[in-house]
UniProtKB/Swiss-Prot annotation:
HAMAP family: THF_DHG_CYH
Name of the protein described by the UniProt record: Bifunctional protein FolD
GO biological process, one term: purine nucleotide biosynthetic process
Keyword Disulfide bond in record: no
GO MF terms, alphabetically ordered: methenyltetrahydrofolate cyclohydrolase activity; methylenetetrahydrofolate dehydrogenase (NADP+) activity
Self-association and partners: Homodimer.
Family to which the UniProt record says this protein belongs: Belongs to the tetrahydrofolate dehydrogenase/cyclohydrolase family.
Catalytic activity annotation: (6R)-5,10-methylene-5,6,7,8-tetrahydrofolate + NADP(+) = (6R)-5,10-methenyltetrahydrofolate + NADPH; (6R)-5,10-methenyltetrahydrofolate + H2O = (6R)-10-formyltetrahydrofolate + H(+)
Annotated binding of NADP(+), by residue: G165, R166, S167, S190, I231
Record EC number: 1.5.1.5, 3.5.4.9
Keyword Amino-acid biosynthesis: yes
Length: 298
């Protein structure tokens, strides 16, 4: 039977440890950690994600600051808000909820976030630190994936790992993080020739293509580990209902794989948990708190 990499279960276990960590250190710091989330416009999915982050913060004792801006706001006004939050001593972490309306220069806004508060790990300073394998904020989804693998003692070093997707949010930082852990990494994308043949070489296959049910059994070798980053809402046979699925056609591959992540309940919960970890990491550094935070992770 294939091993289910249960991100929801692991995230709750880590959240309990994070809650204890905050409780044990907030008297020394004289405040709890603070996370600022900037949302622009009315994208429905963004509303759900921001709500999930706010709830997660509440569960473990992080104070959240939600700034919901109208789409009519100007680029300069958002930049000024970010600069103001950079100097706010009650805020340890900050993120710009993506996607944002196309009229904004996304990367310029992110570049204004203080690297020590950049809990999404998207500021060019943190990306540069990742490339150089120096300590810094790491992107949440890649970090969540690595901790999922570690939680089940799945070895990265020396393994052939294929990453499908080259986004700045997942594919690129994940490939670098795996490379830094001595994985043998192949990054693929929509223009890769013979994609299924390349994927069949993988000991660990990570699907972040953004295409529902792309990966079937022809992409997967016997005994592989498969990580599904995709999440899509499709119409079910009952036209009034929808269902969630990933990039992987799970029912077609499950008999071949050693381990897999479900959708939902796999990578998604761990992404939010690593956001909490990054926020607490920034808080910890600011106050010189106990450096046992890494001991709370797999």
């Amino acid at each position: 039977m294939s091993l289910k990499l249960d991100g929801k279960k692991l995230s709750l276990e880590i959240e309990k440890r994070l809650n204890d960590y905050i409780s044990n250190n907030k008297i020394i710091a004289k405040r709890v950690p603070g996370l600022a989330v900037i949302r622009i416009g009315e994208d429905p999915a963004s509303g759900v994600y921001v709500n999930n982050k706010e709830k997660a913060c509440s569960r473990i004792g992080i104070k959240s600051f939600i700034f919901h801006l109208d789409e009519s706001v100007e680029q300069k006004e958002v930049e000024q808000l970010i600069i103001k939050l950079n100097s706010d001593k009650d805020i340890d972490g900050m993120l710009l909820q993506l996607p944002i309306p196309k009229k904004f220069d996304e990367q310029k806004l992110i570049s204004h976030i203080n690297p020590s508060k950049d809990v999404d790990g998207l500021n060019e300073i943190n990306i540069g630190k990742l490339v150089k394998n120096e300590p810094g904020m790491r992107s949440c989804t890649p970090a969540g994936i690595i901790n999922l693998l570690r939680s089940q003692n799945i070895t990265i070093e020396g393994k052939k790992i294929v990453v499908i997707g080259r986004s700045l949010l997942v594919g690129k930082p994940l490939s670098l993080m795996l490379l830094n852990l001595n994985g043998t990494v192949t990054m693929t994308h929509s223009k890769t020739l013979n994609l299924n043949k390349v994927c069949r070489e993988a000991d660990i296959l990570i699907a972040a293509a953004g295409k529902p049910n792309l990966i079937d059994s022809s992409f997967v070798k016997e005994g592989a580990v498969i990580i599904d980053v995709g999440i899509h809402r499709l119409k079910s046979s009952d036209k009034n209902q929808t269902r969630l699925c990933g990039d992987v056609l799970l029912e077609d591959v499950i008999s071949k794989v050693f381990a897999y992540t479900p959708v939902p309940g796999g990578v998604g919960p761990m992404t939010v948990t690593m956001l909490l970890v990054n926020t607490i990491f920034s808080w910890q550094k600011q106050f010189g708190l106990s450096s046992t935070l890494n001991d709370l992770l797999p």
